[in-house]
From Swiss-Prot:
Entry's family note: Belongs to the geminiviridae capsid protein family.
Motif stretch (Nuclear localization signal): 40-54
Compartment(s): Virion; Host nucleus
Span of the annotated motif Nuclear export signal: 101-122
Protein name, entry field: Capsid protein
Primary subcellular site in the record, as a coarse category: virion
Cited function: Encapsidates the viral genome into characteristic twinned ('geminate') particles. Binds the genomic viral ssDNA and shuttles it into and out of the cell nucleus. Plays a role in protection of the genome from degradation, virus acquisition and transmission by insect vectors, infectivity, and systemic movement. The CP of monopartite geminiviruses is absolutely essential for virus movement.
Zinc finger map (unnamed): 68-85
One GO MF term attached to the UniProt entry: zinc ion binding
Keyword Transport attached: no
A GO biological process held by the record: symbiont entry into host cell
Record keywords, A-Z: Capsid protein, DNA-binding, Host nucleus, Metal-binding, T=1 icosahedral capsid protein, Viral penetration into host nucleus, Virion, Virus entry into host cell, Zinc, Zinc-finger
Pfam families for the chain: Gemini_coat (PF00844)
């Protein structure tokens, strides 16, 4: 049986180009959509672990950040905060110099990740009012810390003093960088009330902090890259409370 000529197949309007669909490899199908510098490593980064090849399951990225040395150290900040409409700031890179598992050995260390755990809640007098209150959280890197941490209104520019529209001021964008941003909402009232909201956030940030020669864990002893957590609620007259446990996981630098 003779085959059809190749030119007839191409010129026929009803003919379609048959392709072999391969759903196993996102790297081969990445050529269909033009992307910027698609590497084989990046194509598998957003896949679940059971769908990755064996090579990407066994050989993972190193746990210790570049330029640092183990072991992984932990520092916790546990406090109840009164979050107001004007905002509040908390320094989460205060680490004392020492030899323990919660201390820094020298001036430099790298905060690899941060874990924010807790809840926001209202007291009994406020939760009976019909309102909705959202707490905005901003994890900010202060590249050039000096003196005391700046207030929320000094760093962020807001429209009509509304924290939900907060962006870093134009003259502050070089010194203050928002690393992560999230929010949590509580609702008060007699019906359909939600008096508390759980906060469970884990982020990899790789923030390289630098201290001066002082040993105390203070903001004023930072010289580079202090880590600040800004909080502000959207309701002007009804405050909200935040009970948080913040843990940072850091490694000492080999330059110490």
């Amino acid at each position: 049986m003779s085959k059809r000529p190749a030119d007839i197949v191409i010129s026929t309007p009803a003919s379609k180009v048959r392709r072999k669909l391969n759903f196993n490899s996102p790297f081969k199908s990445a050529a269909a959509v033009p992307t910027v510098r698609v590497t084989r490593r990046r194509t598998w980064v957003n896949r679940p672990m059971y769908r990755k090849p064996m090579m990407y399951r066994l050989f993972r990225s190193p746990d210790v950040p570049r330029g640092c040395e183990g072991p992984c150290k932990v520092q916790s900040y546990e406090q109840r905060h009164d979050v107001a409409h004007v905002g509040k700031v908390l320094c989460v890179s205060d680490v004392t110099r020492g030899t323990g598992i919660t201390h820094r050995t020298g001036k430099r260390f790298c905060i690899k990740s941060i874990y924010v755990l807790g809840k926001i809640w209202m007291d009994d007098n406020i939760k009976t009012r019909n309102h909705t209150n959202t707490v905005m959280f901003f994890l900010v890197r202060d590249r050039r810390p000096y003196g005391t941490p700046k207030d929320f209104g000094q760093v962020f520019n807001m429209y009509d003093n509304e924290p939900s529209t907060a962006t870093v001021k134009n003259d502050m964008r070089d010194g203050f960088q928002v690393i992560k941003k999230w929010s949590a909402t509580v609702t008060g009232g007699q019906y359909a009330s939600k008096e508390q909201a759980i906060i469970n956030r884990f982020y990899k940030i790789y923030n390289h902090c630098t201290y001066n020669h002082q040993e105390a864990a203070k903001y004023e002893n930072h010289t580079e890259n202090a880590l600040l957590l800004y909080m502000a609620c959207t309701h002007a007259s009804n405050p909200v409370y935040a009970t948080l446990k913040i843990r940072i996981y850091f490694y000492d630098s080999i330059q110490n």
